[in-house]
Design a protein with these regions (language model features):
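Active-site cavity-forming subdomains of large catalytic enzyme subunits
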Residues: 1-107
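Small-residue-enriched alpha-helical segments and adjacent helix-cap loops
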Residues: 14-15, 208, 215-216
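Accessory "access/gating" subregions that flank catalytic or transport cores
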Residues: 90-212
Length: 216
């Protein structure tokens, strides 16, 4: 029941949408039950598909798109949590907030980096531990402390890129062929998952980098 994502998500979507027409099975309250039984229990009738609707249900990117949305929600939580973890590390290390100053990041204005630097300043505002760094003879903090905006920020950039692509895909038509009008149908490749797949790979690397710098 796997899929390659190169011709829609035919296998998983076929299983997923069978219950809509009264076929297949539902996972209902930890039990696997026939779809017809569950529909009847809830006074629901199976959908009567019309021309091309069955193909539209299974020959698209809905499966990879659903996983992308779930992944984005988890990534957003991970990004925010990583900033908090980073700020706690700075406090525990009695580090300096100088690497998070606005002036430093306006001259290399990546959106993600600026966002993280702003968050770090806010999280560490009035920190008594950090204030103890003032007058310290140590010239610079370790890379993993100083480079939090750059590393976390790069991961945020990847997240933002994937988020933009996902918004486009959520509002797109991805089945095939496409009926343009009563007299015109176009066979194309909107079912191909590459626009999301490539960005997902890239964002997976970005997520793992959050763990790498935290481990340092």
């Amino acid at each position: 029941q796997g899929s390659v994502g190169a011709s829609g998500e035919l296998a998983p979507l076929s299983h997923l949408f069978l219950p809509l027409i009264g076929e297949g099975e539902f996972r209902f309250k930890k039990n696997i039950l026939p779809a017809k039984k569950v529909l009847k229990k809830h006074d629901l009738l199976p959908i009567q598909l019309r021309a091309k609707e069955g193909l539209a249900l299974i020959n698209g990117t809905q499966f990879i798109l659903a996983h992308t949305v779930i992944g984005l929600n988890k990534m957003k939580y991970l990004l925010d949590l990583s900033d908090v973890s980073g700020a706690m590390s700075v406090e525990g290390f009695q580090g300096s907030t100088a690497p998070y100053k606005k002036a430093l990041h306006t001259i290399r204005p990546f959106k993600g980096t600026i966002k993280v630097a702003n968050r770090m300043r806010g999280l560490l505002k009035n920190s008594q531990n950090v204030l103890s760094h003032q007058g310290c003879g140590r010239v610079q903090d370790p890379y993993s402390i100083r480079c939090i905006p750059q590393v976390h920020g790069a991961s945020r950039n990847a997240y933002q890129h994937l988020n933009e692509l996902t918004e486009i895909e959520l509002n797109s038509v991805t089945d095939n062929p496409i009926i343009i009008s009563k007299d015109e149908a176009i066979s194309g490749g909107n079912f191909h998952g590459q626009p999301l797949a490539m960005a997902l790979d890239y964002t997976s690397i970005a997520a793992s980098e959050l763990g790498n710098i935290s481990d340092r």
